[in-house]
UniProtKB/Swiss-Prot annotation:
Pfam families attached to this UniProt entry: MlaD (PF02470)
Record-level GO cellular component terms: outer membrane-bounded periplasmic space; plasma membrane
A GO biological-process term: membrane organization
Coiled-coil region: 437-464
Name recorded for this polypeptide: Intermembrane transport protein PqiB
Cytoplasmic topological domain: 1-15
Membrane topology: Single-pass membrane protein
Main subcellular localisation: membrane
Source organism, top-level taxon: Bacteria
Domain notes: Forms a syringe-like architecture with a central channel.
Protein species of origin: Escherichia coli (strain K12)
NCBIfam families: PRK10807.1
Region called MCE/MlaD 2, residue ranges: 158-217
Taxonomic path: Bacteria, Pseudomonadati, Pseudomonadota, Gammaproteobacteria, Enterobacterales
Family that this chain belongs to: Belongs to the PqiB family.
Amino acid sequence: MESNNGEAKIQKVKNWSPVWIFPIVTALIGAWVLFYHYSHQGPEVTLITANAEGIEGGKTTIKSRSVDVGVVESATLADDLTHVEIKARLNSGMEKLLHKDTVFWVVKPQIGREGISGLGTLLSGVYIELQPGAKGSKMDKYDLLDSPPLAPPDAKGIRVILDSKKAGQLSPGDPVLFRGYRVGSVETSTFDTQKRNISYQLFINAPYDRLVTNNVRFWKDSGIAVDLTSAGMRVEMGSLTTLLSGGVSFDVPEGLDLGQPVAPKTAFVLYDDQKSIQDSLYTDHIDYLMFFKDSVRGLQPGAPVEFRGIRLGTVSKVPFFAPNMRQTFNDDYRIPVLIRIEPERLKMQLGENADVVEHLGELLKRGLRGSLKTGNLVTGALYVDLDFYPNTPAITGIREFNGYQIIPTVSGGLAQIQQRLMEALDKINKLPLNPMIEQATSTLSESQRTMKNLQTTLDSMNKILASQSMQQLPTDMQSTLRELNRSMQGFQPGSAAYNKMVADMQRLDQVLRELQPVLKTLNEKSNALVFEAKDKKDPEPKRAKQ
């Protein structure tokens, strides 16, 4: 067997092959696609919200002015399970929308004071609205609001803070009014743990922000105002919005100048009504103590202190108990009440430089006293009335108790009426009622006897009237009248009796005429019937003596 061992040829293997072109190109394209994707991918933000109702990853869009600017990628619970974290991706080039004051909120159907909004989401679904910011740099996390902000961050105007001791007076969205015209809205309502009160943030739109000065006052506007005066009742009603939900009004009180503009976030006090604002202008006061023997039920702090209808001050504390004040409950127990006399109310009458304490002391010496009177019969509210009572015991000076000057008091109002009623009852008890009752009994007995006699008389008269003779009396009277009528007919003109009577009267008249000379003579000379009367001559005229 023949073997043929040839020499092997050794050749160098090529490292590159055209086969690798396809995967390399594919890898380059993939890398370019990835680079293009990430380089053109918009920023990612995290939205914090209490719940993700209606929000779905990959479906819920983010819009700004009705233009799609992003989409929600996922919604997951936070690690502490207290809130929801929503991962959202904005479109490329939308980085300019993100600033510190950028606002996100959920748009969905809502019914509020301004009407119904978000009806379009019934078909398209819930979406997130983005309001671009303008201040600060981009943030990674934002709060997602349940409703749109009442005022945009870039809106022109001013934000102020109202402090109140009562909760629930205002709600976000309530109107802010100036003399009935809406100039802003209530934005937020929070509880301040440091001040221990409720803080409301208000936004006043421009150009009305110039109306907010250091002298303005804010008060709760209920939408309806009832004023009962001696002229009648006056009712004022605001708009339907303020009537249903209320609001807040502000203005410069009467007597103050317009004031100076304030800085943003300036704090003001929220008053209950406009009347309490006028009372708050009197900051200077003098404390006095009053001890009332009457019941103070119905007397509240803030009640007026008046002198014949003119307000002089305010009730401060009811009742007022100092640490070292001790009293024993007995029939002479008196309740202390602290009042404040406000000198600024008396400047018009006393002058700017008058000493109110000295003047009040003089009035107390002249009989000025305090009493409780009813201010409202429906609610039973009381007020302190100051007036002169000359019959009260005189005082030589103002007494003090526990560092407070004392104003003497007298019983007034219902207590005074009760006292007068008791005095009247005492006088009635002191009357000699027994003799009066005996006399009245005797008079009543006499009256009864008189009534019996009168009844007997009436019975007798009834018997007489019922007798036959009394029944015949009208018939007899009619017969007599007929006879009289017939007799009178005989004296009618033309009858014989009438003619005879006329002739007799004529003869009598003739006889009287003939007797007149005789009667005249007898009148001149009574003895003319015995002696002949001489005729007097007529007087002759003579010449007057010269």
